[in-house]
């Protein structure tokens, strides 16, 4: 029913899918001083994937599936259950804890736990992302980190339709829409939602809800450069990954912009009042 349900069920789905596909073994390049911890029957490395020296792959708690063209750089550690998509790169020293799914052509560094990254998402640098859902072409600046557990260990609430919704879960991170970008050092609260094409810069304790297409700079919401500039940026980013911007995508984005205009204006209005 809710996006956080995807995070809850993803580890068990990963295990079921591995059994269903029935693939195991190493077809790609596996360096002689990389290591497998646990049952090697729970590891599948597709042809064209490359595992560098000092990588540790741990299947103790679930299977690991590394797809064609993926590259795992030195000293990275990967825990199952985990899926790593085609041409995705896991950066040196990354700590990929259990329960993660990464789509195609992602760049993943730092620490990640029980999260879903859609294709072309970029988390190149250090920082923690846990129990989160990250959309396509999201770019997380260096040291961007989210909280996924409250200090009092109570259930995390998430804002939906302007009201807090009890998730029923102790661990809930962030839900970040396609093409949203964060600055270096951005710190997300537990249960944060950021919509489409947001531009978020670090500064103090951040809100738990970011309307789509809003900019958040110097601790306040603002309109930013407007939709046309956002679309041009998206086209540039997609072109760098050899993805074409489709007319259908632009239509959907423009419709979403109109649908979220009122909540965006309201957030900007409240920011102006509190900054006076």
Residue spans for each PLM region:
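Structural signal for interior beta-strand "rungs" in well-ordered beta-sheet cores
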Residues: 29-216
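Terminal amphipathic alpha-helical/low-complexity segments used for targeting or macromolecular assembly
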Residues: 1-41, 48, 203-206, 212-276
């Amino acid at each position: 029913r809710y996006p956080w349900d995807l995070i809850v069920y993803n580890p068990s789905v990963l295990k079921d899918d591995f059994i269903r596909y029935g693939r195991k073994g190493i077809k790609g390049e596996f360096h002689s001083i990389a290591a497998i911890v646990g049952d090697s029957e729970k590891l599948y490395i597709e042809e064209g994937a490359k595992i560098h020296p000092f990588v540790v792959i741990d299947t103790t708690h679930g299977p690991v599936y590394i797809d064609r063209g993926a590259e795992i750089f030195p000293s990275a550690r990967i825990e199952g259950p985990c899926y790593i998509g085609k041409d995705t790169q896991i950066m040196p020293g990354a700590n990929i804890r259990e329960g993660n799914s990464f789509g195609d052509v992602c760049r993943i560094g730092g620490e990640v736990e029980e999260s879903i990254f859609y294709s072309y998402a970029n988390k190149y640098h250090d920082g923690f992302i846990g129990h989160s859902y990250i959309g396509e072409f999201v770019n997380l600046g260096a040291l961007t980190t989210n909280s996924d557990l409250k200090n009092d260990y109570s259930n995390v609430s998430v804002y939906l339709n302007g009201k807090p919704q009890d998730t029923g879960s102790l661990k809930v991170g962030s839900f970040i829409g396609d093409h949203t970008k964060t600055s270096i050092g951005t710190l997300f609260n537990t249960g944060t939602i950021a919509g489409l094409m947001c531009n978020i810069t670090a500064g103090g304790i951040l809100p738990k809800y970011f309307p789509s297409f809003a900019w958040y700079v110097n601790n306040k919401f603002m309109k930013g450069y407007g939709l046309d500039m956002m679309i041009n940026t998206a086209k540039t980013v997609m072109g760098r990954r050899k993805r074409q911007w489709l007319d259908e995508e632009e239509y959907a984005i423009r419709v979403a912009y109109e649908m979220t205009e009122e909540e965006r204006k309201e957030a900007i209005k409240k920011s102006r009042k509190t900054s006076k």
